[in-house]
């Protein structure tokens, strides 16, 4: 039986279809969920990229106060896997499920390009299919992706070169319990060679490995 996964769709989400497709071709049974839905039936919850509520106030700030946020927090407490990609990462930060802050890129510009990353930690549900120290290539697309380290964090991914001014070139972090992962790069956009590369596939393969252990 395929693990059930869901993609939370906010007003302004624009990577929900990419996330759904990545799940579908990597062994999951995906569903879209809305802001009034329950999350009890899912083993993996993805908060996708985009511009939820137009990034008003701050990116992710309004979405973090939606009704679905209670369901996400409850799922996190129960140990379910949650992955926030780009705007989804911003939402998890705003909810307090991940440490730190995400501010405007140091360049003041929106950055959209493929970047090189280093897998700093492969002992996670999201990266166990990688080798520690493995160099991978995944695209980014954000204007507010500069990670500010407020406390000690479990760094999972790091940019090889500084791309947005993030502290210590941090690209992705994990919560203390190990079940909530936030990252600015888009693994769902790197699952097929046809569209530029498939290093992102290993993220979904890692989750599958973990759920089927």
Curated annotation (Swiss-Prot):
<dbReference type="GO" id="GO:0004642">
    <property type="term" value="F:phosphoribosylformylglycinamidine synthase activity"/>
</dbReference>
<feature type="active site">
    <location>
        <position position="186"/>
    </location>
</feature>
<feature type="active site">
    <location>
        <position position="188"/>
    </location>
</feature>
<keyword id="KW-0963">Cytoplasm</keyword>
<keyword id="KW-0378">Hydrolase</keyword>
<keyword id="KW-0658">Purine biosynthesis</keyword>
<dbReference type="GO" id="GO:0006189">
    <property type="term" value="P:'de novo' IMP biosynthetic process"/>
</dbReference>
<keyword id="KW-0547">Nucleotide-binding</keyword>
<keyword id="KW-0436">Ligase</keyword>
<dbReference type="GO" id="GO:0004359">
    <property type="term" value="F:glutaminase activity"/>
</dbReference>
<feature type="active site" description="Nucleophile">
    <location>
        <position position="86"/>
    </location>
</feature>
<keyword id="KW-0315">Glutamine amidotransferase</keyword>
<comment type="subunit">
    <text>Part of the FGAM synthase complex composed of 1 PurL, 1 PurQ and 2 PurS subunits.</text>
</comment>
<comment type="pathway">
    <text>Purine metabolism; IMP biosynthesis via de novo pathway; 5-amino-1-(5-phospho-D-ribosyl)imidazole from N(2)-formyl-N(1)-(5-phospho-D-ribosyl)glycinamide: step 1/2.</text>
</comment>
<dbReference type="InterPro" id="IPR029062">
    <property type="entry name" value="Class_I_gatase-like"/>
</dbReference>
<dbReference type="Pfam" id="PF13507">
    <property type="entry name" value="GATase_5"/>
</dbReference>
<keyword id="KW-0067">ATP-binding</keyword>
<comment type="function">
    <text>Part of the phosphoribosylformylglycinamidine synthase complex involved in the purines biosynthetic pathway. Catalyzes the ATP-dependent conversion of formylglycinamide ribonucleotide (FGAR) and glutamine to yield formylglycinamidine ribonucleotide (FGAM) and glutamate. The FGAM synthase complex is composed of three subunits. PurQ produces an ammonia molecule by converting glutamine to glutamate. PurL transfers the ammonia molecule to FGAR to form FGAM in an ATP-dependent manner.</text>
</comment>
<feature type="domain" description="Glutamine amidotransferase type-1">
    <location>
        <begin position="5"/>
        <end position="213"/>
    </location>
</feature>
<protein>
    <recommendedName>
        <fullName>Phosphoribosylformylglycinamidine synthase subunit PurQ</fullName>
        <ecNumber>6.3.5.3</ecNumber>
        <ecNumber>3.5.1.2</ecNumber>
    </recommendedName>
</protein>
<dbReference type="GO" id="GO:0005524">
    <property type="term" value="F:ATP binding"/>
</dbReference>
<dbReference type="GO" id="GO:0005737">
    <property type="term" value="C:cytoplasm"/>
</dbReference>
<dbReference type="InterPro" id="IPR010075">
    <property type="entry name" value="PRibForGlyAmidine_synth_PurQ"/>
</dbReference>
């Amino acid at each position: 039986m395929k693990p059930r996964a869901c993609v939370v769709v906010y007003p302004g989400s624009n990577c929900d279809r990419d996330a759904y497709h990545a799940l579908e071709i990597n062994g999951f049974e995906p569903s879209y969920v809305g802001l009034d839905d329950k999350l009890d039936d899912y083993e993996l919850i993805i908060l996708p990229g985009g511009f939820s509520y137009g990034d008003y106030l701050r990116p992710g700030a309004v979405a973090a106060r939606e009704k679905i946020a209670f369901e996400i927090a409850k799922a996190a407490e129960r140990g379910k896997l949650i992955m926030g990609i780009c705007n989804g990462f911003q939402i998890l930060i705003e909810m307090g499920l991940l440490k730190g802050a995400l501010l405007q890129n140091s360049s003041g510009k929106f950055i959209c390009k493929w970047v090189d990353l280093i897998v700093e930690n492969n002992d996670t549900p999201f990266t166990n299919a990688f080798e520690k120290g493995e160099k991978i290539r995944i695209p980014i697309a954000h204007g507010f992706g500069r990670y500010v380290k407020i406390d000690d964090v479990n760094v999972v991914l790091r940019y090889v070169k500084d791309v947005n001014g993030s502290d210590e070139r941090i690209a992705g972090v994990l919560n203390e319990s190990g079940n909530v992962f936030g990252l600015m790069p888009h693994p769902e956009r790197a699952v097929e060679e046809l569209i530029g590369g498939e290093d992102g596939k290993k993220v979904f393969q890692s989750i599958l490995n973990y759920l089927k252990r």
